[in-house]
A protein has these predicted regions:
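Catalytic cores of the polymerase beta-like nucleotidyltransferase superfamily
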Residues: 1-391
Length: 391
């Protein structure tokens, strides 16, 4: 590559942060100081950014021209971007959200595949390394208050690393909530940050508590505020077992009725698997708490409601959710799991030759169900001799 000598390349953000924490990091975000879009293209970079110039090199890494931002309207889209060649590295880092994300290392060279060789020197104009060592989340500048997404990001990083949040950053986030900045967040963006938190974090409940403390939960997810204390312990248990995002979501809304749960997650633009598991978990919890008799007929009816014969994974996840919520449900969950296992292979071929020849339509389903009920009844009579399944 042939760039003028004043053009400099730096890796920034997550890579520098996570290397200092001795964590694996797949983020390779680069900043280019002093270059123009034309220079980048002439040197084989492919432009991909629409709002501001971002380029890919042969290794697939992103290189963005150094830029400054100026707030011109409400919300996280309301920024005007300046990527003039005079923008310095420090000016680019100054626009970033947190001090721990505002560090850089210079690129010294590249190998034949486009992978960068880096300087060992940490460029750290805002003391992010000290905040990492102290376990503290701190904003770089008051420009933090111009982007409501940064509230969610700050809390996400705090939950991810178990860090404290600097008092001045807490105060700024509370001001942003009072000023209505979070009202401009779209459901899609809230879900994206929420999903990242539950994927990365070992303390989802702490994230929700911090949202509540600053008043953001009342704006973003008011329906779950009342039930939050009851799900703190189940969430901690689920986090400890590295449960999926869908399981954690189902726990969060398990106190709500089925209709409300489905509406809640659909409004938050959650994927279908999250909505489905949350709905079935709320249904099963209500059944266990208010109307469980444990008859063979009810067990079969519940298995069918869980689509257990078509989606055994969904059933297992639902049983995990309700046992996270209440350990007392473990025995009943085991009964359901075993009943599904011993009846899953009962099908049309299990009927007598006469039944196969004469039954039609729903009569076939009724006959199959009768066989399943018979099998479950036999199991219930002898289940004290059977093993159990752990969820």
């Amino acid at each position: 590559m042939t760039f003028p000598s004043h053009v400099k390349f730096f890796i920034v953000g997550g890579y520098v942060r996570d290397r200092l924490l001795n964590c694996e990091c797949n983020d390779h975000d680069f900043v280019v100081v002093g270059a123009t879009p034309e220079m980048m293209i002439e040197n084989g970079f492919q432009q991909v950014g629409a709002d501001f110039p971002v380029f890919l090199n042969k290794a697939g890494d992103e290189y963005a021209l150094a830029r400054k931002e100026r707030k011109v309207a409400a919300g996280y889209h309301g920024f005007e971007t300046d990527f003039d060649t005079s923008v310095t590295l420090e000016e680019d880092l100054f626009r970033r959200d947190l001090t721990i994300n505002a560090m850089a290392r210079e690129v010294l060279s590249w190998d034949d595949n486009g992978h960068a060789h880096l300087s060992d020197e940490i460029i750290d104009p805002f003391n992010g390394r000290r905040d990492l060592e102290d376990g503290r989340i701190r904003h770089v500048s008051d420009a933090f208050g111009e982007d409501p997404v940064r509230v969610l990001r700050a809390l996400r990083f705090a939950a991810r690393y178990g860090f404290d949040i600097a008092l001045e950053t807490y105060d700024l986030m509370k001001w942003m909530v009072r000023d209505g900045e979070l009202n401009h967040l779209t459901a899609e963006r809230v879900w994206l940050e929420f999903e990242k938190t539950m994927t990365e974090s070992v303390d989802t409940s702490d994230f929700l508590q911090m949202l509540e403390i600053i008043g953001a939960l009342d704006i973003l997810m008011p329906e779950i505020v009342k039930g939050l204390p009851a799900v703190q312990s189940p969430l901690e248990d689920a986090d400890g077992h590295f449960a999926s995002v869908a399981i954690k979501c189902a726990i969060i809304t398990s106190h709500m009725n089925q209709q409300a749960v489905g509406d809640f997650w659909r409004r938050r633009k959650a994927p279908n698997e999250v909505v489905s598991l949350a709905v079935t978990s709320a249904m099963l919890r209500f059944t266990f708490e208010h109307c469980w008799e444990g008859t063979a007929e009810q067990i079969l009816s519940t298995l069918k409601a869980l689509a257990a014969f078509n989606n055994v994974g969904g059933m297992v996840d639902t049983l995990r959710v309700v046992t996270y919520i209440n350990e007392a449900f473990t025995e009943t969950a085991t009964v359901l799991s075993t009943a599904q296992h011993i009846t899953k292979d009962i099908s049309f071929g299990s009927l007598t030759e006469d039944q196969q020849a004469t039954l039609k339509g729903k009569e076939i389903g009724e006959a199959i169900d009768a066989l399943r009920v018979k099998e479950i009844k036999q199991y219930l009579e002898t289940r004290s001799f059977l093993g159990t399944t752990t969820f």
